[in-house]
């Protein structure tokens, strides 16, 4: 009998700094099923990298506040890497995407080989 796949998806996201005009890069995984917990968990791994020059995609709204202010999602290239104006920030985003790729491969392999180890 076939087991349903978990389909854990790993993505790179931004979090606004509270005190400065910069954004923290982090890798988010969802859904992650952990032992002892009934509901799927959202796992965040912060990369200790910040960027200050993301390019915002004005055609993709993230949310609109009660006072009418709209925030936007970052612009991404064809590979899903966040676009930045400065070269240093762009390298940080490429690094974050490499980490995302590694984590995605780990979750995919864990899902594939979980059945073979149990037998």
Regions flagged by a language model, labelled:
Residues 1-119:
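Basic/aromatic DNA-contact patch characteristic of tyrosine site-specific recombinases
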